UniProtKB/Swiss-Prot annotation:
Domain of life the protein comes from: Eukaryota
Start and stop residues of the WD repeats: 347-386, 388-426, 428-464, 466-507, 549-593, 594-633, 636-667
Keyword Repeat on entry: yes
Quaternary organization: Component of the SCF(sconB) E3 ubiquitin ligase complex.
Gene (UniProt): sconB
Protein name, per record: Probable E3 ubiquitin ligase complex SCF subunit sconB
Species this protein is from: Talaromyces stipitatus (strain ATCC 10500 / CBS 375.48 / QM 6759 / NRRL 1006) (Penicillium stipitatum)
Amino acid sequence: MNGSGSTAKESLFNPTPRKLGLPEDNTMTPYNGVRSIFDNSSGSRQLTDEHTNQERAISKAKLADENIAPFLAKHIPSQYAPLGADASKTTGPPRPMNSRYCYRHRPDLKCRRQADEPSMDHLQWELQSLSQSDQQGIAHVWSLFSAAPAKQRELMLRGILAQCCFPQLSLISSSVRDLIRIDFITALPPEISFKILSYLDTASLCRAAQVSRAWKCLADDDVVWHRMCEQHIHRKCTKCGWGLPLLERKRLRASKEQIEKRALGVSVAPDSSTIAVQTVDATSGVKRTAEDLEGSDSQVVKRQRLPTEDTELHRTNVRPWKDVYKDRFKVGTNWKYGRCSVKVFKGHTNGVMCLQFEDNILATGSYDMTIKIWDMETGEELRTLTGHTSGIRCLQFDDTKLISGSIDRTLKVWNWRTGECISTYTGHLGGIIGLHFENSVLASGSIDNTVKIWNFEDKSTFLLRGHSDWVNAVRVDSASRTVLSASDDCTVKLWDLDSKQCIRTFQGHVGQVQQVIPLPKEFEFEEDHDAGHEEDSNASVSGDESPLRQEPCSPGASFFEGDRPAPPRYILTSALDSTIRLWETYSGRCLRTFFGHLEGVWALSADTLRIVSGAEDRMVKIWDPRTGKCERTFTGHSGPVTCVGLGDSCFVTGSEDCEVRIHSFKN
């Protein structure tokens, strides 16, 4: 048994006594072995052989320990140093982290993978069923493998696998299948885990939160759900096609910088100079506090792993973004399936011609010459503004003032909180049937076919002439210093306030245009090429034949030179030809026509997710602005629907039947 004729594989897995550190024993020959088995002549001889075998096993174990101990002490001195460690080798600077090891086997870290208790119990039971010598041999093999460096481990494993039969390979395959499943979310730094989780959809995130407490902490974090809110709220997600109703934009803006810093692994230290911005969620009324980082030198500090008292207090006052998303998702689902509650406000004695609402305040104007202020939650009429001598056709209000326009040719400015009329403006030769203000610029449209611009800062005014019939609606865009106007002459015009000239005319309607509204900048149109070509050809027949219309142009290129902002890219118009049209202002093209109303469309309101229209046919329709599909139709008014208002979780309609209806999708 000197092993000279054995292969390398045999010498690896069938070591001779010399390879284990044992001297060759001439008594261990085949002859002696056979003689010890078949010679039963003396019982004392058998006892002597048993005693010799025990001594030999003990001697083998001692010699194996003497050979294995230096190997273990060399590779894992911190865990196994029975011979004593050299103090001179332990002094000095700490060794740098070795990146060649995986996170399970780094020498400077303990294994963070928990042992499988049932498997270890079964392994221990099987080991104890073996003889003492077999237990020692197996323990030595485990110790050698545990202490071996990575390359030697791989060599050992390849050799073991080469000796395995198919049943053993099957056992290895079934065992490895579970062992290689790594909890990467917990093992990775939080910043990388946030990045991974941010690619999941809502259903997958909710499932991830059920895996473990560590996963729940990461999957429910504001970093992940703030990004989810940005993807879906007030816009259609390009991945899933879902869009959720708008909530206060301040909340997204104020929290965005803090959330982004947390996602990168840093946090913003609270500063006494920061301004706290509090907003109220439209669905539940729970306040969410966010720090406004503008104008403050916020100190960026290293991220704290343990929450402090300040952060805990902040968390108790801040509503999690997951809850915000959940509420918005419920509202969005109600919008999709038409689940809503209806409130009817009665108080006007003539047709309701205009309305606007903000938060829970609703203002309505009527042909009965009054403006009424309502509490939308309770339905209570807060006050009535009187002073006009004819029907009120248009109004708009903000936090401090309300401006109304009437057939009596006047504009009135009100303190709507007290009911006081602050001032009255005259200048039109006919009744005022449309108005809109933004910042310090007010535009009004009149029966006298003109648009008048009022500047509150320098008190200047001027007229825009070009329409040949009543101007029914106007919209100011103060950023680009432009105004849109819709008229009974079947056209829509875009005006430059600096040059006081019309820079584009949109033609295509065959009935009087009643409304024009710009779509938010966040709106992105997905053009259907077949439908788009059809709309282009139809619009070009009756549209403006100027070169500006036919040439494709980049945003703002055909309007202004330099860095001046361009006007809104997309606008919506409605007319008494029973249609709604979507236009691109840069090219002048009509991108889509919405068909469905049976009679003229009087009222129009829209955001990035939907369009609401009211018509002479007494119906209110909800449209998808991207596809042109009518998603739902609401009835209930007994007269033409003359005005509509759209919010994140409700829409309001007014009619010539003197009623105001609120459709709420909150519950």
